[in-house]
Swiss-Prot record:
One CC-aspect GO term: plasma membrane
Entries under InterPro entries matching the protein: YedD (IPR025596), YedD-like_sf (IPR038624)
GN (gene name): yedD
Protein name as catalogued: Uncharacterized lipoprotein YedD
Annotated compartments: Cell membrane
Organism: Salmonella typhimurium (strain LT2 / SGSC1412 / ATCC 700720)
Length: 141
């Protein structure tokens, strides 16, 4: 039993935290300037193809949609939380992605995302099919 506790503590300290139950994650409101639509620009090493697009939708209340598209759309709802003082997106599949913002640029899952006016049509369709629990950001003009 002591070994399990020690290993668990080491994983948390090493930044390898794991979420056992998505519903137990405490949602954090989006910090100022993070609410909105974010999208990859150009090829990203973390995506399967140079034509693939990664998008992140963040509501003011901290709900998210991680939307990646290439030959199909994979859209995972999630929520923002603080893990070890780092702002992190936790998806319903319990995947953890740290978020770092610098102006209109995000570092997210090893990718660089830029602020955009609205989601891609494919991600907008995913949002219509499975809406987030809180209101979406207002699209930019």
């Amino acid at each position: 039993m002591k070994k399990v506790a020690i290993v668990g503590a080491l994983l948390v300290l090493a930044g390898c935290a794991e979420v056992e139950n998505y519903n137990d994650v405490v949602k954090t409101p989006a910090p100022a300037g993070l609410e909105g639509y974010w999208q990859s620009k150009g090829p990203q090493r973390k995506l399967v193809s140079p034509e693939a697009i990664a998008s992140l939708v963040v509501t003011k209340e901290g709900d998210t949609l991680d939307c990646r598209q290439w030959q199909r759309v994979i859209a995972l709802p999630g929520k923002l939380t603080m893990l070890s003082d780092d702002l992190t997106n936790v998806t319903v599949k319990r995947e953890l992605y740290e978020i770092e913002r610098d102006g209109n640029t995000l570092e997210y899952d090893g990718m660089t995302l830029q602020r955009v006016a609205r989601p891609t049509p494919e991600c907008a369709a995913a949002l219509e099919k499975t809406p987030l629990p809180t209101p979406l950001p207002t699209p930019l003009p």
